[in-house]
């Protein structure tokens, strides 16, 4: 159950908070680069 919840949580975040998801993606991309 924990694995399923952990997998679904980000999906809900991207659906309900697309702006936040974009910011997170930009931050991760900058961190990697």
From Swiss-Prot:
Recorded superkingdom: Eukaryota
UniProt entry tagged with the keyword Cytoplasm: no
GO MF terms, alphabetically ordered: toxin activity
Cross-link (Cyclopeptide (Ile-Pro)), chain numbering: 11-18
Post-translational changes noted in the entry: Processed by the macrocyclase-peptidase enzyme POPB to yield a toxic cyclic octapeptide. POPB first removes 10 residues from the N-terminus. Conformational trapping of the remaining peptide forces the enzyme to release this intermediate rather than proceed to macrocyclization. The enzyme rebinds the remaining peptide in a different conformation and catalyzes macrocyclization of the N-terminal 8 residues.
Propeptide: 1-10, 19-32
Keywords: Toxin
InterPro entries the UniProt entry points to: Amanitin/phalloidin (IPR027582)
Family: Belongs to the MSDIN fungal toxin family.
Functional description taken from the UniProt entry: Probable toxin that belongs to the MSDIN-like toxin family responsible for a large number of food poisoning cases and deaths.
This protein's name: MSDIN-like toxin proprotein 5
